[in-house]
């Protein structure tokens, strides 16, 4: 005990000292590898939770990796010792909060990775101390809000990755002081991007990712559409797909016109004009002192423009560009793309970031993938949507191993043969929407280990076989909306860490929680609207599961379609007892007032045990356990009872009404059955015995009329208990002519060694009893005839008839002699002495 106390106190003292003193060299705890004079410090999975306790490495510049540790909260000055770090990886730490000043001291930091954590907000003081940051990655978090001024100090920030979060809007002027060239906001909740305050500050961007947001294609999206139409062709901008209103659902924003977006005419036309640098109002000041002004003009009287304005040499016709924008565009246009073949009916362009080829074959009336000749080299993106492709063969993608995106949407594909995509190991996005696929099976997606986004909406899918998505361990987004699905197989999502799931507008009447929905452990968004939900007992489990989800995960509330009384009523507004009246039908005592129903729920849903139905397994196991415990307890009680009963001393029986039981005596006499002989020895010989006091026993209850009764004894002898009065009568009839012989009497009493041993054992055993005796009775053993003859031959004749009453004191001497073997010479001497008498 003292040892444990000593260890605990020592640990507390050491932890207290560690808070203020740096005692461990980081390279002694982590792995340090130098590559081309650059040190890489890998502290992944080494249980580090206080980096400020580590000494910095000796190198001038180094990369720090603290992934997969216990950094749940970053306190101020956490990395103050690592002033020469150029990159810091903090991914996969379940990081929930970053306090202001946590990055103080990282003045040389260029890259910061905060991906795959649980951050919910980026505050204005989150990035204090890292003003030289150029690359910030914060994807796959739970970020909902970004405070104004969060990036104001990051003047050199060029790459910002915020995809797959819960961001619904961007605050005004959030990017005003940053120099962004790459912005990724995919997979969020953004419905609109205003020009003023957001788009006007990202004029330097060369890559903008907009996919997988619920874009509201209304008048609010006209600024984004106008801005996209005026961007140079060599700038990569992801597709913005309309989600609302319903008549534009699934449409690309660039394919819509202004009349469709804003039919009422309010703000029906927008035009982005870049004004001369002479105007300073609301301008952006460049490092050389010039200010570029961008304003937004609304020309209500102007008729709608076409959605495809002509572009000459990357500059919008009729638009004037500032020197800054012009020089930037020219720099990208002067870059010589690699010589690569492009299929005849398609249009190819080189991606500016990695020089990968983007092949655009949209709406070229292509009947088969075999028409794409010559096959492009180093293709990263392949758009074949809007054609007439019906079948996809195994050999169609043999030369597209480097694809990152494959768009086969809006075709007439009915059959996809197995292992068609097996060689597309780098594919991250696959579009199969808008086809006529009816059935999904595992072989279709074989080989797509890195696939993250799968679009299967607007098909005729009726059945999905078990294990279909198991070959995609990185799948995060799955769109199955607008199909004909009625059910899903068990464990269909167990092999895919889905974050976003869309099952809207199918034929689901209910969805099981057990084995299906409970497998969605990383869910951030789910859409179940537009299904004919049957609001009965089968939907109670789904309702309980939805109630446990965090706010914002469910896109829209579910509405009942059947039964009729619940039509168009939101599921969450109905109580469980109303959905399932069986929950109220439980046996209970009679009460005059209604009592609230108690519903026992589990993660699998409510437990309903109808009368006569099977007993739940949990109750059965509990019952068996109770029975076993009771059985062991009863057996233990019986064992204790038996042991205690055996240890108790023999209970003395109380007297049976006879007051003489306490004075009963036990005497030994020999009784010969052959009384017809005249020999005096044949009658009886008295040997005085000590009166043994006995406890009260059952013999006390004998009637006075009973003079004796027999007990079983060793073979050849009988034990007879006689009354003391009978004994006295027998003594009166003793032959007076008989001579007294002590030896004779002893021999007659103990005719053999066995008898002697018996008496000796008997005398020794009497110590175990306290006052054992029977008052008024004697014990007699009949003598054997053969022993009698042997004694006569030894002694030589009959003795005189003398009765000697031994005194009580002589008994002890006789007793001592009986316990030892008799001497033959002594016997002869005593015999001679007696004969003389």
UniProtKB/Swiss-Prot annotation:
Main localisation: membrane
Glycosylation sites (chain numbering): 81, 325, 423
PANTHER family: SLIT AND NTRK-LIKE PROTEIN 4, SLIT AND NTRK-LIKE PROTEIN 4-RELATED
LRR repeats: 60-81, 84-105, 108-129, 132-153, 156-177, 179-200, 378-399, 402-423, 426-447, 450-471, 474-495, 497-518
Protein name: SLIT and NTRK-like protein 4
Localization per Swiss-Prot or TrEMBL: Membrane; Cell membrane
Function: It is involved in synaptogenesis and promotes synapse differentiation. Suppresses neurite outgrowth.
Keyword Repeat applies: yes
Ranges of the Extracellular topological domain: 19-618
All residue ranges annotated as the LRRNT domain in the record: 333-375
Tissue expression remark: In the adult, significant expression is detected only in the brain. Broadly expressed in embryonic brain with highest expression in subventricular zone, subplate, cortical plate, pyramidal cell layer of hippocampus, thalamus and hypothalamus.
Organism: Mus musculus (Mouse)
Membrane topology (Cytoplasmic): 640-837
Domain LRRCT intervals: 213-264, 531-582
Taxonomy, superkingdom: Eukaryota
Similarity section: Belongs to the SLITRK family.
Transmembrane segments: 619-639
Disulphides: none
GO BP: axonogenesis; behavioral fear response; cell population proliferation; long-term synaptic potentiation; memory; positive regulation of synapse assembly; smoothened signaling pathway
Subunit structure, interactors included: Interacts (via LRR 1 and 2 repeats) with PTPRD (via extracellular domain).
InterPro entries named among the record's database cross-references: Cys-rich_flank_reg_C (IPR000483), Leu-rich_rpt (IPR001611), Leu-rich_rpt_typical-subtyp (IPR003591), LRR_dom_sf (IPR032675)
Membrane topology: Single-pass type I membrane protein
Keyword terms: Cell membrane, Glycoprotein, Leucine-rich repeat, Membrane, Repeat, Signal, Transmembrane, Transmembrane helix
Position of the signal peptide: 1-18
């Amino acid at each position: 005990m003292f040892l444990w106390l000593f260890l605990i106190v020592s640990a507390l003292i050491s932890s207290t000292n560690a808070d203020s003193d740096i005692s461990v060299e980081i390279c002694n705890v982590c792995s340090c590898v130098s590559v081309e004079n650059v040190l890489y410090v890998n502290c992944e999975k080494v249980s580090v939770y206080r980096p400020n306790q580590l000494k910095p490495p000796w190198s001038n510049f180094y990369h720090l990796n603290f992934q997969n540790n216990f950094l749940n909260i970053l306190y101020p000055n956490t990395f103050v010792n690592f002033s020469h770090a150029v990159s810091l990886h903090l991914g996969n730490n379940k990081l929930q909060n970053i306090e202001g000043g946590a990055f103080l001291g990282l003045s040389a930091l260029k890259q910061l990775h905060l991906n795959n954590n649980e951050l919910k907000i980026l505050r204005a003081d989150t990035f204090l101390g890292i003003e030289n940051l150029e690359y910030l990655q914060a994807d796959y978090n739970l970020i909902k809000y970004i405070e104004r001024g969060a990036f104001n100090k990051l003047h050199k920030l060029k790459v910002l990755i915020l995809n797959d979060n819960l961001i619904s809007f961007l605050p005004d002027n959030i990017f005003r002081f940053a120099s962004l060239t790459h912005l990724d906001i995919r997979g969020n909740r953004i419905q609109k991007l205003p020009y003023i305050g957001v788009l006007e500050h990202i004029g330097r961007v060369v890559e903008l990712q907009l996919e997988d947001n619920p874009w509201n294609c209304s008048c609010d999206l006209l600024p984004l559409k106008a801005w996209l139409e005026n961007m140079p062709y060599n700038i990569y901008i992801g597709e913005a797909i309309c989600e609302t209103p319903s008549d534009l659902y699934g449409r690309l924003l660039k394919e819509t016109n202004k009349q469709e977006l804003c039919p009422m005419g309010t703000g029906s036309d927008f035009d982005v004009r870049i004004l001369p640098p002479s105007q300073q109002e609301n301008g952006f000041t460049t490092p050389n002192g010039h200010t570029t002004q961008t304003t937004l003009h609304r020309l209500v009287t102007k008729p709608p423009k076409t959605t495809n304005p002509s572009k000459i040499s990357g500059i919008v016709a009729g638009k004037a560009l500032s020197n800054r924008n012009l020089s930037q565009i020219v720099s990208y246009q002067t870059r010589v793309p690699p010589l690569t073949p492009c299929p005849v009916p398609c249009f190819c362009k080189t991606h500016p970031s990695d020089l990968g080829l983007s092949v655009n074959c949209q709406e070229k009336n292509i009947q088969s993938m075999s028409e794409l000749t010559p096959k492009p080299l180093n293709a990263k993106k392949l758009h074949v949507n809007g054609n007439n492709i019906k079948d996809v063969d195994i050999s169609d993608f043999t030369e597209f191993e480097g694809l990152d995106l494959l768009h086969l949407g809006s075709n007439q594909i009915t059959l996809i043969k197995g292992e068609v995509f097996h060689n597309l190991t780098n594919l991250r996005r696959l579009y199969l929407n808008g086809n006529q696929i009816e059935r999904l099976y595992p072989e279709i997606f074989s080989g797509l280990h890195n696939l993250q986004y799968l679009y299967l909406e607007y098909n005729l899918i009726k059945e999905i076989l078990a294990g279909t998505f198991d070959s995609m361990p990185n799948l995060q987004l799955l769109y199955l909306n607008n199909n004909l699905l009625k059910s899903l197989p068990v464990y269909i999502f167990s092999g895919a860490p889905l974050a976003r799931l869309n099952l809207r507008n199918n034929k689901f009447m209910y969805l099981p929680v057990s084995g299906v929905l409970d497998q969605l452990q990383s869910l951030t968004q789910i859409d179940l609207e537009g299904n004919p939900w049957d609001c009965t007992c089968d939907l109670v489990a789904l309702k309980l599961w939805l109630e446990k989800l965090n706010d914002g995960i469910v896109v829209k509330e579910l509405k009942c379609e059947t039964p009729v009384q619940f039509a168009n009523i939101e599921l969450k507004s109905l109580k469980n007892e109303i959905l399932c009246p069986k929950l109220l039908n439980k046996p209970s005592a009679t009460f005059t007032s209604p009592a609230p129903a108690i519903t026992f729920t589990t993660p699998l849903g409510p437990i309903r045990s109808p009368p006569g139905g099977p007993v739940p397994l949990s109750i059965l196991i509990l019952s068996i356990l109770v029975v076993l415990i009771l059985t062991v307890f009863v057996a233990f009680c019986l064992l204790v009872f038996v042991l205690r009963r055996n240890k108790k001393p023999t209970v003395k029986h109380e007297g049976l009404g006879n007051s003489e039981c306490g004075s009963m005596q036990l005497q030994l006499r020999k009784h010969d059955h052959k009384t017809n002989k005249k020999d005096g020895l044949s009658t009886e010989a008295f040997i005085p015995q000590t009166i043994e006091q006995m406890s009260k026993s059952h013999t006390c209850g004998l009637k006075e009329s009973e003079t004796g009764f027999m007990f079983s004894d060793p073979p050849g002898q009988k034990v007879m208990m006689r009354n003391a009065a009978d004994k006295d009568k027998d003594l009166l009839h003793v032959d007076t002519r008989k001579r007294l012989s002590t030896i004779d009497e002893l021999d007659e009493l103990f005719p053999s060694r066995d008898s002697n041993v018996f008496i000796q054992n008997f005398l020794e055993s009497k110590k175990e009893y306290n006052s054992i005796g029977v008052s008024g009775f004697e014990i007699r053993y009949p003598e054997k005839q053969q022993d009698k003859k042997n004694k006569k031959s030894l002694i030589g004749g009959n003795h005189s008839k003398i009765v000697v009453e031994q005194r009580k004191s002589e008994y002890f001497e006789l007793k001592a002699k009986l316990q030892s073997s008799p001497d033959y010479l002594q016997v002869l001497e005593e015999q001679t002495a007696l004969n003389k008498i």
